Amino acid sequence: LVGSEMCIRDREDTEELEQCLGMCDGLLLTGGHDVDPAVYGEEAIPECGQCCHARDVMEAYLLKRAVEKDLPVFGICRGIQFMNASLGGTLYQDLDTQHPSETEHHMTPPYDRGVHKITVKEGSLLAGMIGAGEHSVNSYHHQAVKELAPGAEAMAYSEDGLIEAICIPDKKFIVGVQWHPEFAFEKDPECLKLVQAFVDAC
């Protein structure tokens, strides 16, 4: 059933995770805690926020198996960050400290409006969904993709040079975006197209 909830009793029990994944047509990695810098081999700086080790362990296993099985994966905000870190890339732990700019990355409500521009790469998977060129997106994050994971492709950049969307080109649908289409799809047809593309891939 679409959107059905699953109760995972032990997030480090791989047998239980396999059973759950076997009932899924796709994997959605949502926003939330900061990604533990240990995932990408770094020490946490003071500005790094709260992390959740159990979540990182669980999502690392689910992502690894989803990639192996070529299940559709859609990462949103923390989701794109975790995808990149778990697959071998790195993150900015705190943008104000490590990548200061005038671009608004930590907006205030309402969240269904665009606050900065991105440029979508011509010929990319994302361009096929929403079109290449300039788009306006919402933005609510303080971490971001830094060094791209091996095998991943950057599909969009913000005005200050941050990677805003990635994919794994040789997979069916493994896509991550830094913005929040789930906040804006009722008003923004491009966000709706993105959500629909994931649903269709599943």
Can you annotate each of these PLM segments?
Residues 9-74, 87, 92, 97-101, ...:
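Flexible gly/pro-rich beta->alpha loop and the following alpha-helix that scaffold active-site loops
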Residues 1-8:
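Short, small-residue-biased leader/transition segments that mark boundaries at the very start
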Residues 50, 87-164, 187, 201:
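Pocket-forming structural segment of enzyme catalytic cores
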Residues 177-202:
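Acyltransferase
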Residues 77:
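Conserved G/P- and acidic residue-centered "switch" motifs that form tight phosphate/ATP-binding loops
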Residues 80-82:
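Hydrophobic, aromatic-enriched interface-forming segments
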Residues 32, 171, 182:
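Flexible loop residues that form catalytic
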